[in-house]
A protein has these predicted regions:
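A cross-family phosphate/adenosyl-ligand binding-site feature
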Residues: 1-399
Length: 399
C-alpha cells in the first residue's frame, strides 16, 4: 500500500470520487504543492500531478509522486495524457487546479499557447469544458502588471476561477492550503446553498465589570466556524459574526467581531441574509460597569446583575429563516427536547439545535435538531459532520 492511501478521507469524504489534476508551475510556492496534494487526498480526492520544466527546478517529480501516490506527468507523450485525462470522455478528471500558477502560465493560457504540460492540460480543459481553478503566486510587481491583470480578467470571463493570492509586502503569496482546499470543495460540492445568504453568529459575549474584569460564558466558537465552513463548501454566501473565541477563523470567511451584547444588538440592524443561525454563547445577564479598576484587596464584592435582552427577539423582526441554539446541562433527552421546543415557540424560531453539555468534547458533539414543521432528529459526530447535518435540516426546512 502506498503511504498516500493511509491518509485518504481522514478529514472528510467531501471530494470522494473526484479526480483532480494538479498543475505545478515554476514559482517558489511550488514547495507548497506537496502539502496541497495531500490535503486534497485527506478530503477524499484522487490527485494526479502535472509539472512544468521550471517547476522541476524547485521540487522533483519524485516529491509529487510521493505526495499523490500517482505517476507524475512531466511530458506529453504517446499516452496523450492531456486528452485521456481532460478530453471529452466520460471518465475524465473533474477539475484542473493550477497551484501555484506563474504570470507566465496565466498569460500563455489566456493566449491559447500550450508549450508546457500544464498549459497543454489547460488548453484541453477549456476546450472540453472541464472546470479550471488557478491560484497565482508571484512578486507583487508581476501580479499588478496590467497585461497580467487583463489576462486574469479574460480567463475569468471564460469561466476559470481564480483563488486570489495573499498580498504581503512585495509578494502576492499563494493562498493557504486550507483556502485552496475549501474552494475546491466548494467548486466540486453539491452547491445546494448556491444563491443563499447565510449569517452565523458565534463565540461568546463579554460584559465588563470594570476596565479589567468581565462576565462571560464558556464558548470556543468552534461550532460557528464549522457551520460557516460547511455553508461555504456548499456555495452559500457566508458571513460570520464572532464574539470571544479560541479557535482560528479562516481568513477567507467574511467576518465581523463583537464584544458585548450591546455591540451585537447594534449590529442586528445590518442583517439582510436569508438564513441566520445563532450558535453563540451570549450573556443572560449584564452588570453596570464600574469605571477604572475595582481594587483587588476588597474582602467582599457584590455585583448586581440584571437580565439581558434576548438577541433572538431582535433578529426575529427580520425577514429570515432563524435557527437558534439551546445548551442544557445534565438533563434527560426528553427534558432537552421539551426545553428546546419551548424556546422555539417562545421566540418564534424556524428551528432550534439543542445539546447537553455532557455530550460535548473537543472536536465532537451530539445535538438534537427540530423545526417548526415538526421534524426532529438527533445526530452525533465530529463538529464538521454535525455542521453539515444541521445545514441538511435547514435545507430540508426551506425546500
Amino acid at each position: 500500500m502506498h503511504p498516500s492511501e493511509s491518509i485518504w478521507g481522514t478529514k472528510s469524504k467531501s471530494l470522494a470520487g473526484k479526480k483532480i489534476i494538479l498543475g505545478v508551475t515554476g514559482s517558489i510556492a511550488a514547495v507548497e504543492s506537496l502539502e496541497l496534494a495531500r490535503e486534497l487526498i485527506r478530503h477524499g480526492a484522487q490527485v494526479r500531478a502535472v509539472m512544468t520544466p521550471e517547476s522541476l527546478k524547485i521540487i522533483t517529480q519524485h516529491t509529487m509522486e510521493f505526495a499523490t501516490g500517482q505517476p507524475v506527468i512531466t511530458n506529453i507523450g504517446g499516452q496523450v495524457e492531456h486528452v485521456s485525462l481532460l478530453g471529452d470522455f466520460p471518465d475524465r478528471a473533474d477539475l484542473l487546479l493550477i497551484a501555484p500558477c506563474t504570470a507566465n502560465t496565466i498569460s500563455k493560457i489566456a493566449a491559447g499557447i500550450d508549450d508546457t504540460p500544464v498549459t497543454t492540460m489547460a488548453t484541453t480543459a477549456v476546450g472540453s469544458g472541464v472546470p479550471i481553478m488557478i491560484a497565482p503566486a508571484m512578486h507583487i510587481s508581476m501580479y499588478r502588471h496590467p497585461i497580467v491583470q487583463k489576462n486574469i480578467k479574460t480567463l475569468t470571463e471564460y469561466g476559470i476561477e481564480f483563488i486570489d493570492p495573499y498580498i504581503e509586502g512585495k509578494k502576492a503569496k499563494l493562498a493557504s492550503v486550507e483556502e485552496i482546499t475549501e474552494r475546491v470543495i466548494r467548486r466540486l460540492g453539491p452547491r445546494d446553498f448556491l444563491g443563499k445568504r447565510i449569517l452565523i453568529i458565534g463565540g461568546s459575549s463579554a460584559e465588563p465589570i470594570d476596565d479589567m474584569r468581565i462576565i462571560t460564558n464558556r464558548g470556543t466558537g468552534e461550532t460557528a466556524v464549522q457551520i460557516a465552513l460547511a455553508a461555504f463548501e456548499r456555495s452559500a454566501d457566508v458571513e460570520l459574526w464572532m464574539g470571544r473565541s479560541s479557535v482560528t477563523i479562516p481568513e477567507f470567511i467574511r467576518t465581523k467581531r463583537f464584544e458585548t451584547l450591546a455591540d451585537l444588538l447594534e449590529m442586528v440592524g445590518e442583517i439582510d441574509q436569508d438564513i441566520v443561525l445563532v450558535p453563540a454563547a451570549l450573556s443572560d445577564y449584564t452588570v453596570e460597569k464600574t469605571e477604572g479598576k475595582i481594587p483587588s484587596d476588597k474582602e467582599e464584592l457584590v455585583l448586581h446583575l440584571r437580565r439581558a435582552p434576548k438577541v433572538l427577539e431582535s433578529i426575529r423582526k427580520k425577514k429570515c429563516v432563524l435557527f437558534g441554539f439551546k445548551a442544557e446541562s445534565s438533563v434527560t433527552a426528553d427534558e432537552l427536547v421539551a426545553r428546546a421546543r419551548s424556546r422555539m415557540i417562545e421566540f418564534e424560531l424556524d428551528g432550534i439545535v439543542a445539546n447537553d453539555l455532557r455530550e460535548v468534547s473537543k472536536g465532537t458533539t451530539k445535538v438534537t435538531i427540530m423545526t417548526k414543521k415538526g421534524t426532529i432528529c438527533t445526530v452525533a459526530g465530529s463538529k464538521k459532520e454535525v455542521a453539515h447535518r444541521i445545514l441538511d435540516e435547514v435545507l430540508r426546512y426551506i425546500t
